[in-house]
Amino acid sequence: MSKSERLDGGLEALGIQAGTVNLNWNEPRLYQEAVQRGEAEVAEGGALVVKTGAHTGRSAKDKFTVRDSETEDQVWWDNNAAISPEHFDALWTDFQAHMAGKELFVQQLFGGADLDHRLPVRVVNELAWHSLFIRHLLRVPAAEEYAGFAAEFTIINLPSFKADPARHGCRSETVIGVDFARRIVLIGGTSYAGETKKSVFTILNYLLPAKGVMPMHCSVNSNPNGEDATIFFGLSGTGKTTLSADASRTLVGDDEHGWSPNGLFNFEGGCYAKMIRLSAEAEPEIHATTKMWGTVLENVVMDPQTRVLDLDDDSLAENSRGAYPLSAIPNASETGRCGHPKNVIMLTCDAFGIMPPIAKLTPAQAMYHFLSGYTAKVAGTEKGVTEPSATFSTCFGAPFMPRHPAEYGALLRELIAEHQVDCWLVNTGWTGGAYGTGNRMPIKATRALLNAAMDGSLNSAAFREDPNFGFMVPIAVDGVDASILDPRSTWSDKAAYDDRAAKLATMFIENFKTFEAHVAPYVRAAAPKVRELTAAE
């Protein structure tokens, strides 16, 4: 690292003429600075409370990738909005001008715990609390690693910058611009800190597959020795965080991981958990972080006099969040690494009540369901609508996948085959009927089924083939009511189940048409079947 990079984090070399550079400030300094500047307040227990204003979630429609010779054939343009190199040039010039003479906070951090595949990143912020946030979320170098630190990507986040759609080729005053050739991400016009976290994820999702490393939107746990690992894929609301938090196992991470020849590794060093209506009974470890010094609470309502938090109040945001280091969780991994997985779990919250509580997948079925990324959400009740809606988010994280999903799917299939991993589909949604008539799958049953899968005993169970989806469903499992293992038997109206199952199968088939041309015939053959019912049925 050059002398200038040691002094200013390499900003001058980027053409940034900052007034003051606060390089690698630690948590106490950033805490104090955020409060003194009026960016944040301290809650009872010591957490830092901040408000992000108009933006309380990601601005997905304001994210753009530079379309140039490097990215033209690498990026999945059906899913990623493009910006021209000329528009990005104008944006970069205006960002440089906006930073001139300003006080900036710079963190030199690693994305990834695998020493062979981690990414050194430079994160530039104008807000002290943003600098604290990303210091929690990424991995802080050891003291001796700073001397040789050379950032390979730069992320600059300036909430006070307002983009000009005509000049910058964007959609609004908010912009997230990614230039893979120049290795720069520019974030402007939003204070929502999750944009920085997900920018790092997007970068790694682009870079790692070229190295044969699989990036994943998932949680991971292992046994205390770092072996017998399990990957949990799942969209929001499927139970990914809850089910991977197991007191008898080590939590490697809750959101973003890679799978390399060395095993599994966390991209992050912290967690970014949903706080709304968080329960001390249901999730005690996460709830405890709300009363911890160091935690950054985003859009959590606090009494201005008593400084007591109200986690049930959604007046600032439904998407209230807490950022804290992984070390705040008692059974978290110190290294962020573990061995190769023994099991892959794909979680779905099926509000239609069709999916079994657990099913075993072949490698082809695993790739099919990974590319489908299915869950079902319950519609809002503001107009009295209670009909569930199907959600398909490919790779269980479509907004963060720059490459074509088939590229990630093929890599996952190869790794599953190489390491002989068992794959399971787990439904945490409804049984005995759809949402409104059925009941939520008992979490006790889900945990018992997961434990049987993870300890290997489920492999010796008797299975039946599901007539709609073709996967194998256990007939009996110790500690689980056998009736819930057959979803059709739990419905009082069997004809209604058959009709709904056919509709869901059709949704899968329609959704997968996007990927059919990009996958092998045996993966296409893993699709569900819309079957003709016999008179007996």
Swiss-Prot record:
Cofactor: Mn(2+)
Pathway field: Carbohydrate biosynthesis; gluconeogenesis
Calcium among keywords: no
Domain of life: Bacteria
UniProt: ATP binding residues: K198, H217, G234, L235, S236, G237, T238, G239, K240, T241, T242, E283, R321, T446
Cofactor binding notes: Binds 1 Mn(2+) ion per subunit.
Alphabetic keyword roster: ATP-binding, Cytoplasm, Decarboxylase, Gluconeogenesis, Lyase, Manganese, Metal-binding, Nucleotide-binding
Record: residues binding substrate: R58, Y192, K198, R321
Known catalytic reactions: oxaloacetate + ATP = phosphoenolpyruvate + ADP + CO2
Localization per Swiss-Prot or TrEMBL: Cytoplasm
Main location: cytoplasm
EC number: 4.1.1.49
Sequence positions that bind Mn(2+): K198, H217, D255
Alphabetized Gene3D superfamilies for the sequence: 3.90.228.20, Phosphoenolpyruvate Carboxykinase, domain 1 (3.40.449.10), Phosphoenolpyruvate Carboxykinase, domain 2 (2.170.8.10)
A single cellular component GO annotation: cytosol
Role description: Involved in the gluconeogenesis. Catalyzes the conversion of oxaloacetate (OAA) to phosphoenolpyruvate (PEP) through direct phosphoryl transfer between the nucleoside triphosphate and OAA.
Similarity remark: Belongs to the phosphoenolpyruvate carboxykinase (ATP) family.
Name of the protein in question: Phosphoenolpyruvate carboxykinase (ATP)
Organism: Maricaulis maris (strain MCS10) (Caulobacter maris)
